[in-house]
Curated annotation (Swiss-Prot):
Disulfide bonds join C41-C96, C139-C189, C235-C287, C329-C385, C426-C479. This is Neural cell adhesion molecule 1. Residues 499-598, 600-696 form the Fibronectin type-III domain. The chain crosses the membrane at residues 712-729.
């Protein structure tokens, strides 16, 4: 017990100690092996502490800054203990002690438990096993508490399969007895600790290796040596992993690297290719397949055969009638070849003997001999030795020469006649070659006494050419041949030929218009061939014989001839004679027959010729007897034999002798029936059958009528087409747009004005003619009926290629465009309203000025006929698509319009011809200057007083007849306008070819004259310039073309008729004042002059 005095102090310190509070957060901890964790020691209170210390489970104080177990003083009131990468030995009670000067020591503890998580210590993947072995899948699991192990395969517990082959061993390994390839896959080793609810698993790949199995595709292979061929030895192997293949020959490994020229392998080594097989390659070859599970091999025996080859032959020479000679032939090959002999005329088998025993053949092993006894000259020639076995054969020729004396052959008797050249042939057989001579009566030929004889020699014959002049040339001729073995002579007789005897007529088969004569050949030909047969016939009672010659070759084939051109129901006599080179022979006895009455024709004769394509045929129809009536046609029917339907019947005119049947079925039999028909009826059908060719897989090039073009030819053609296209485009640009290469050449080399020079030409007064063209002008007058937007009050439209240029200041419904294209003045009257237009001067003359021509139209006072005037019936028909329009009534008020003369060049020839009113309204008319002046004067008067009556003309044209009114479209396409070029005619031509004014008025549209077009003038022919003058003038003025004729005005004109006349011509010196121009016209001219 404590003393009483110490008790108060003890209570004091206990009270102080009790006042200190030390806590460790967390208060307890569990750490798995390998993990890290920290603990915080905290002190509650405001006193200052001297120290905060940590002690390990074994009582040792933990020092700061250790590597694995670290202690760190955070501040005056806390400290941290950190355990890194914990292990089992770190488990225990850790103590935190707090020391204070004022209050003493206080402490707190924490129990640190360290456990081992589930770990797979030994569970390799993959694990491989051999098929059929007992496999044990290893899986070692490490844990603080004993785990429960479960094996799964394909997501299921293997023990639930109830397969006795699967067993979990005591060490938790999985055993599979007699493992199969189907057992291969992924197995999961899964460990569980129930106390902690911990689970972990490891997937193990199980591979089952299968030992290789190998088999040879052919256990025995045959090959042929010395053919530069290759042989392939092949083995097929299975197994897992894929086995590797190696080869041996008679136990020795084959390496491709050692002899690449002899051996090669495919990509997996399963095929061995032996190149250029020879006899040394015959051996036993083994293919070996090997993998992880084992190896296996297969054997292939290669047997090499040799094609026969002739190794020895020898040419021989013998004398005729010599005792014997032997020909020898040796050959090699495997199997041993058999040897046969043959000549050019026969085959000689082994052990064969001729009937007379002259030829003997003996064979032994690889040698054969041919023995000839009592040699004859016919034994000479080529002997072929052939060695053959199951692999092939080989042949070699040897030659036997037999020397013998000459032997002569040839026809002994030769026929000819005086003057006919003939050859006497002396064929000579001799070895060595013989010298041939001809003799006549012991005299060597040729000689001076026989100038009509020539000799021609060849190596095998001699020909004596004789042209008999008289009886003396006929007789015996001797041929003699000599060589070093001997000589031979032969006599030949030249006999004078005679005409043939008569043929005999056996039977005559008459028809309506023909007769078929059967005959026998003459008994004697006269020594020379019969060339023709002459048939003669006449009707009973006629004195003259009709005759015809028939070729002997054709007549002798069937022994018949056919006489044609006979009359029905008429009795005839016929006789025959043969013709040879000597002449016509004896005539046979006549044979009488009577032709049949008119009837249906005989069936024609058919011949076929297959086409090159194989499925077409040309059937020739050969006419036979027509039955006394001309054949009208042939009826042709055909079909394939396997088909029940006939093709459509073909009617062939009698003048055509064949028909082509095309697009027939391939490899099919066809039958054709042809019937001839005349007025009396139809003949019996003629039948012809044929078969088409089999359908070719590839059509041969020869069937094509033309050979294919090569690549170079095709490229060349394309280049030519491209160049031609460029030329065409350039020419088009030249004529239409005045541009392109041709235009550049014309401008730079020929001095032609370019497109940019048009305005300049206008300013210089060059208008519409080039340097070398005529100075005679042409004025083209055209009637326009299309109303432009400007005249209709619509929006102004810019001119383009498809819209005409218009003149906005005129309000007239009908106007005519006047273009002065050359300095000559041309104009005329029209039954339309007043024609008006303003042009600038187009002359280079320094005195040229702007002139206004005014034309007015009024009814004539009197109609004065003119001899040159055209009647209405002579009017040219209206253009296609144009509607006739009636001229205006005579009471119409004349309208005045100024015309501009583009030339001040005078002309002395006044107009003499009266022009039809359609000329001016339809096309340009040629007028004299007097007429133009008269029109100008009238225009002037009209400008002063518009109501003044016009001056009547001296000459009038008869009124145009009225024509029915037709609706006309006021819109034209550029194509239609281009298709209707205006034409300028001379007065003479206009009088000859007047145009219909109403149809022209209805046609409407502005038509430009064709460029470079030839025009007939009174003084000759000239070409218009290749530029559009109207377009250039209005381009310079900055205005559009005159207004077109409105459709309404055209209909108004169509409802009335009127006469038109040419105003009286003023004096030649009379001028038209320019001051009478309207204000708008004056403004346009000033504008043009300023430019």
């Amino acid at each position: 017990m404590l003393p009483a005095a110490a008790l108060p102090w003890t209570l004091f310190f206990l009270g102080a100690a009790a006042s200190l509070q030390v806590d460790i957060v967390p208060s307890q901890g569990e750490i798995s092996v390998g993990e890290s964790k920290f603990f915080l020691c905290q002190v509650a209170g405001e006193a200052k502490y001297k120290d905060i210390s940590w002690f390990s489970p074994n009582g040792e104080k933990l020092t700061p800054n250790q590597q694995r177990i670290s202690v760190v003083r955070n501040d005056d009131f806390s400290s941290t203990l950190t355990i890194y990468n914990a292990n089992i030995d770190d488990a225990g009670i850790y103590k935190c002690v707090v020391s204070s000067v004022e209050e003493g020591d206080s402490e707190a503890t924490v129990n640190v438990k360290i456990f081992q998580k589930l770990m797979f210590k030994n569970a390799p993947t993959p694990q491989e096993f051999k098929e059929g072995d007992d496999a044990v899948i290893v899986c070692d699991v490490v844990s603080s508490l004993p785990p429960t192990i479960i094996w799964k395969h394909k997501g299921r517990d293997v023990m639930l399969k109830k397969d006795v082959r699967f067993i979990v061993l005591s060490n938790n390994y999985l055993q599979i007895r007699g493992i199969k390839k189907t057992d291969e896959g992924t197995y999961r080793c899964e460990g569980r600790i129930l106390a902690r609810g911990e689970i972990n698993f490891k997937d193990i790949q199980v591979i089952v290796n299968v030992p290789p199995s190998v088999r040879a595709r052919q256990s025995t292979m045959n090959a042929t040596a010395n053919l530069s061929q290759s042989v392939t030895l092949a083995c097929d192997a299975d197994g897992f992993p894929e086995p590797t293949m190696t080869w041996t020959k008679d136990g020795e490994p084959i390496e491709q690297e050692d002899n690449e020229e002899k051996y090669s392998f495919n990509y997996d080594g399963s095929e061995l290719i032996i190149k250029k097989v020879d006899k040394s390659d015959e051996a036993e070859y083994i293919c070996i397949a090997e993998n992880k599970a084992g190896e296996q091999d297969a054997t292939i025996h290669l047997k090499v055969f040799a094609k026969p080859k002739i190794t020895y032959v020898e040419n021989k020479t013998a004398m005729e009638l010599e005792d014997q000679i032997t020909l020898t032939c040796e050959a090699s090959g495997d199997p041993i070849p058999s040897i046969t002999w043959k000549t050019s005329t026969r085959n000689i088998s082994n052990e064969e003997k001729t009937l007379d025993g002259r030829i003997v053949v003996r064979s032994h092993a690889r040698v054969s001999s041919l023995t000839l006894k009592e040699i004859q000259y016919t034994d000479a020639g080529e002997y072929v030795c052939t060695a053959s076995n199951t692999i092939g054969q080989d042949s070699q020729a040897m030659y036997l020469e037999v020397q013998y004396a000459p032997k002569l052959q040839g026809p002994v008797a030769v026929y000819t006649w005086e003057g006919n050249q003939v050859n006497i042939t002396c064929e000579v057989f001799a070895y060595p070659s013989a010298v041939i001579s001809w003799f006549r009566d012991g005299q060597l030929l040729p000689s001076s006494n026989y100038s009509n004889i020539k000799i021609y020699n060849t190596p095998s014959a001699s020909y004596l050419e004789v042209t008999p002049d008289s009886e003396n040339d006929f007789g015996n001729y001797n041929c003699t041949a000599v060589n070093r073995i001997g000589q031979e002579s032969s006599e030949f007789i030249l006999v004078q030929a005679d005409t043939p005897s008569s043929p005999s007529i056996d039977r005559v088969e008459p028809y309506s218009s023909t007769a078929r004569v059967e005959f026998d050949e003459p008994e004697a030909t006269g020594g020379v061939p019969i060339l023709k047969y002459k048939a003669e016939w006449r009707a009973l009672g006629e004195g003259e014989w009709h005759s015809r010659l028939y070729d002997a070759k054709e007549a002798n084939v069937e022994g018949t001839i056919t006489i044609s051109g006979l009359k029905p129901e008429t009795t005839y006599s016929v006789r025959l004679s043969a013709v040879n080179g000597k002449g016509v022979g004896e005539i046979s006895l006549p044979s009488d027959f009577k032709t049949q009455p008119v009837r249906e024709p005989s069936a024609p004769k058919l011949e076929g010729q297959m086409g090159e394509d194989g499925n077409s045929i040309k059937v020739n129809v050969i006419k036979q007897d027509d039955g006394g009536s001309p054949i009208r046609h042939y009826l042709i029917k055909y079909k394939a034999k396997h088909s029940s339907e006939w093709k459509p019947e073909i009617r062939l005119p009698s003048g055509i002798d064949h028909v082509m049947l095309k697009s027939l079925d391939w490899n099919a039999e066809y039958e054709v029936y042809v019937i001839a028909e005349n007025q009396q009826g139809k003949s019996k059908p003629a039948h012809y059958a044929f078969r088409t060719s089999a359908q070719p897989t590839v059509i041969p090039a020869s069937t094509s009528p033309t050979s294919g073009l090569g690549t170079a030819a095709i490229v060349g053609i394309l280049i030519v087409i491209f160049v031609l296209l460029l030329v065409a485009v350039d020419v088009t640009c030249y004529f239409l747009n005045k541009c392109g290469l041709l235009m550049c050449i014309a401008v730079n080399l020929c001095g032609k004005s370019g497109p940019g020079a048009k305005g300049k030409d206008m300013e210089e007064g060059k208008a519409a003619f080039s340097k070398d063209e005529s100075k005679e002008p042409i004025v083209e007058v055209r009637t326009e009926e299309e109303r432009t937007p400007n005249h209709d009050g619509g929006k102004h439209t810019e001119p383009n290629e498809t819209t005409p240029l218009t003149e906005p200041e005129h309000t007239a419904d009908t106007a005519a465009t006047v273009e002065d294209m050359l300095p000559s003045v041309t104009t005329g009257t029209t039954n339309s309203d007043t024609i008006t237009e303003t042009f600038a001067t187009a002359q280079n003359s320094p005195t040229s000025e702007t002139t206004t021509l005014t034309s007015s139209i009024a009814p004539p006072a009197t109609a004065i006929p003119d001899s040159n005037a055209m009647s209405p019936g002579q009017a040219t028909p209206a253009k296609a698509g144009a509607s006739p329009v009636s001229p205006p009534p005579p009471s119409s008020t004349p309208k005045v319009a100024p015309l501009v003369d583009l030339s001040d060049t005078p002309s002395s020839a006044p107009a003499t011809n009266n022009l039809s009113s359609s000329v001016l309204s339809n096309q340009g008319a040629v007028l004299s200057p007097s007429t133009v002046a008269n029109m100008a004067e009238t225009s002037k008067a009209a400008a002063g007083n518009k109501s003044a009556a016009p001056t009547p003309a001296n000459l009038t044209s008869p009124p145009a007849p009225s024509e029915p009114k037709q609706e006309v479209s006021s819109t034209k396409s550029p194509e239609k306008e281009a298709a209707q070029p205006s034409t300028v005619k001379s007065p003479t031509e206009t009088a000859k070819n007047p145009s219909n004014p109403k149809s022209e008025a209805a046609s409407g549209g502005t038509t430009n004259p064709s460029q470079n077009e030839d025009f007939k003038m009174d003084e000759g022919t000239f070409k218009t310039p290749d530029i559009d003058l109207a377009k250039d003038v209005f381009a310079a003025l900055g205005t559009t073309t005159p207004a077109s004729v409105a459709s309404g005005q055209a209909r108004e004109l169509a409802s009335s008729t009127a006469d038109s006349s040419v105003p009286a011509a003023p004096a030649k010196t009379e001028k038209t004042p320019v001051e009478d121009k309207s204000e708008v016209q004056a403004t346009e001219i000033r504008h043009l002059q300023q430019k």
